[in-house]
């Protein structure tokens, strides 16, 4: 594993903008409002013929109203303490730290407390004075930061000033004993989960794209790649708690406050010798209830993450039941043919006598997409958590199924012989042959004399038969009917 460097500092000093600039991607949400970043995010800094290294963006370390500024990190209380804990864990993983400060605001008491705190860690520290927009301002805006006793470098994350110099200085902080010619390919092999996330850009798939566009942009068929699982759901459904429980860590900040998670955060872990990555996302609410820009960015990032995952885990609240927003998310994933499963979390809060009725209600409400697995789980007690990853791995395998044309046509003959298509307008549809057009998800095309005569119930019968014959139980599936004498006529 290659070395990492942490970005640490007060809220709104530009850490996330700097993070995005260094990894050359827009992964971290940035906004003028302080405290946007909460959970730590990881990325890779690359350069042509340069040694790659990891960086960790941490949440802004601040004090709440119950602590005095003079207390420094030891005085942090409440929700902000979780952000500090995340930063402490990031620092422990890293070989060095960049203390990011705001050159426009100047040196503040809390910058000094953070510097003292970082000095006690024994890690090399570089003070990065951000928001310095030109060389003519460097001496004036950086002078007072030399009192901290660390090397100082002025940059502008927004305008790109001195960023190449910063990369060079950060590489100089890496331990010499690790410099053994690690190239980009080796870095990708050791951190494929982070690398996949870094590949996301602003022009990724959006909710308005067509099914075909989204299919082309989903994960390619790469059996060796670690299984990538995206957590999706309404705010406070327990997505972060599930990630922590499944990975056996406190990687994600968890609180009773809805909307705690804002960025889409990758959490890599290993189990039974295999590598996996969970992508924890911000809660998705109805557009009419989204009142600020940060939440809008978070929701867009959450939906985009589903197109970059092998399987999406849609988390519902067992106590609240299926809401209208849950139904919209299910319908959206089903329409897009996104591989997904439904996790009904917080089963520990449902009275024992009401559990069976509750499970029955969930199954009835999800009857319109019967292929989607439904698991009842509890992040708090661990109930049924061990079933999630194996089932997700099965869905991924089913999405990669490829069936030879000859085998498909023998199956089609058997299916049609068993149940002939109904006569429509005094003509019975005649089937010629079938082929698999693609996988991810499995897509089949049946050529008939007149596709317009294939009715929805019979199309459903064909799909169910294909699932039964070829063991495609939970993966999404597309079945198209094409007229042999009508070009581009599909149903």
UniProtKB/Swiss-Prot annotation:
Residues binding GTP 1: 9-16, 57-61, 130-133
Domain of life of the source: Bacteria
GO molecular function: GTP binding; ribosome binding
Keyword Transcription regulation: no
Record-level GO BP terms: ribosome biogenesis
CDD domains: EngA1, EngA2
All copies of domain KH-like, residue ranges: 401-485
Quaternary structure (record): Associates with the 50S ribosomal subunit.
Protein name (Swiss-Prot/TrEMBL): GTPase Der
């Amino acid at each position: 594993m290659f070395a990492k460097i942490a970005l640490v500092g007060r809220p709104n000093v530009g850490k996330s903008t700097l993070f995005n600039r260094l990894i050359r991607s827009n992964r971290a949400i940035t906004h003028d409002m302080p405290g946007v970043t909460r959970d730590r995010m990881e990325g890779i800094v690359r350069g042509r013929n340069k040694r790659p290294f990891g960086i960790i963006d941490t949440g802004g370390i601040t004090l709440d109203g119950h602590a005095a500024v003079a207390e420094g990190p030891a005085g942090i209380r409440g929700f902000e303490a979780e952000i500090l804990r995340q930063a402490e864990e990031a620092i422990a993983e890293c070989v060095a730290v960049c203390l990011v400060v705001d050159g426009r605001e100047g040196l503040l008491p809390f910058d000094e407390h953070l510097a003292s705190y970082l000095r006690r860690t024994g890690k090399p520290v570089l003070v990065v004075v951000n928001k310095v927009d030109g060389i003519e301002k460097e001496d004036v805006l950086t002078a007072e930061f030399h009192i901290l006793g660390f090397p100082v470098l002025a940059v502008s994350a927004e305008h790109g000033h001195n960023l190449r110099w910063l990369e060079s200085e950060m590489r100089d902080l890496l331990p010499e004993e690790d410099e053994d010619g690690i190239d980009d390919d080796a870095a990708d092999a050791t951190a494929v989960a982070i690398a996949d996330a870094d590949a996301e850009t602003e022009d990724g798939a959006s909710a308005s794209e067509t099914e075909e566009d989204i299919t082309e942009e989903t994960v390619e068929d790469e059996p060796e790649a670690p299984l990538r699982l995206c957590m999706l759901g309404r705010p406070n459904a327990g997505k972060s708690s599930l990630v922590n429980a499944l990975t056996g860590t406190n990687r994600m900040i968890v609180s009773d406050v809805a909307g705690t998670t804002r960025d889409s955060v990758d959490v890599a872990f290993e189990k039974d010798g295999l590598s996996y990555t969970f992508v924890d996302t911000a809660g998705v609410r109805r557009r009419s209830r989204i009142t600020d820009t940060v939440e809008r960015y978070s929701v867009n990032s959450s939906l985009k993450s589903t197109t970059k995952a092998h399987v999406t885990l849609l988390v519902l609240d067992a106590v609240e039941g299926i809401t209208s927003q849950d139904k919209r998310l299910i319908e959206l994933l089903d329409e897009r043919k996104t591989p997904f499963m439904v996790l009904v979390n917080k089963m520990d809060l449902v009275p024992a006598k009401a559990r069976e009725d509750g499970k029955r209600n969930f199954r009835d409400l999800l009857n319109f997409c019967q292929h989607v697995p439904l698991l009842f789980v509890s992040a708090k007690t661990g109930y049924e958590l061990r079933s999630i990853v194996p089932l997700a791995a099965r869905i991924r395998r089913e999405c990669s199924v490829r069936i030879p044309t000859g085998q498909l046509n023998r199956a089609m003959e058997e299916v049609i012989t068993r149940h002939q298509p109904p006569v429509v307008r005094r003509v019975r549809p005649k089937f010629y042959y079938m082929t698999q057009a693609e996988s991810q998800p499995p897509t089949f095309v049946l050529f008939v004399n007149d596709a317009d005569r294939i009715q929805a119930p019979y199309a459903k019968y064909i799909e169910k038969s294909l699932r039964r014959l070829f063991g495609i139980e939970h993966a999404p599936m597309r079945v198209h009917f094409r007229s042999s004498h009508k070009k581009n006529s599909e149903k």
